[in-house]
Amino acid sequence: MIDVRTLYKEEEGNYGWYDYQPMIEAFGNVAVQVDDDDYQGDTRVLYDNNGKIGHLVFGWGSCSGCDALQACETLDEVQELCNMLENSIIWFDSKAEALKWFETHDWGGSWEWFYDETKKYVNLSIKYLEGENNGL
């Protein structure tokens, strides 16, 4: 597990945490990342940790009432959130296994498929897993 104290500081007068990127990058090598371009939405990440592939999707908001990280009042709470996100990553043993999952997953049966960013993420991930545009 990641120790969030290496990613975030707890200081006098701290008004909270808002940036998920340190956590996202601490989980591994980001191969593809697509975020919604809005004040609230989802982040989708494909990891490639030396051939072990990870898939993470999580939502975020614009205030402490609708965003889990902004709602954290202590680093212990940030740690709990980080652990939950890390544990929610779906891991595949190989690119081939991940590619099969991406190609056969019922994306159309999911609410997230109706967002252009999800379609972009899926398409970029498939291209990456097929070996195309590995410099994404």
Please state what every model-predicted region is.
Residues M1-Y18:
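Charged, compositionally biased non-catalytic regions
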Residues I2, V30-V32, L124:
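Residue-level marker of intrinsically disordered, low-complexity segments enriched
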Residues R5, N50, L69, G135-L136:
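Intrinsic disorder/low-complexity detector
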Residues W60, G65-L69:
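Short, His- and charge-rich active-site/binding loops that engage polyanionic ligands
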Residues N14-F27, V34-D35, L69-C72, D76-C82, ...:
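The transition from N-terminal targeting/processing segments to the mature protein
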